[in-house]
């Protein structure tokens, strides 16, 4: 039986819940990203990393990228958890920001500075598959910078006339104002099937 490691980085529990469900379905081992950086992942056949989406970035992606260099010969899958994942443009921007753009910037820098090809780990990282799962938002639990960011989101979307808001923007605004829990185990099916090779 193949060994699967599931690694997560989140703030409020949704990402961890998805990671636990993926572990259940794959008989995998669960690790927080903090734990994962301390262990030898080479003993695993497949590695799944999931992070919460925060201002377009996937939490922990930079740390995971360092881990990836050691496990790039394994089967690696990623997932991101957020409120606005129904918006195709938001998903595309998330992929570009966290995978493709990083790979592109590194490639340009390496080529310009050293006049050589980009390292294989960078190329592969830029092409990792990523699944998107809907998260939860509880205004009462949000503090600090997160509260400020969500206040800005509320102002930006709420400042538009209702007729000009997209459906996903309206749903996001309602979630920010009232809270929402979209966490649903059914989201993991395609990722689990990929890990199992189905």
What residue spans do the PLM features occupy?
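FMN-binding flavodoxin-like domain, especially the glycine-rich phosphate-binding loop
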Residues: 55-198
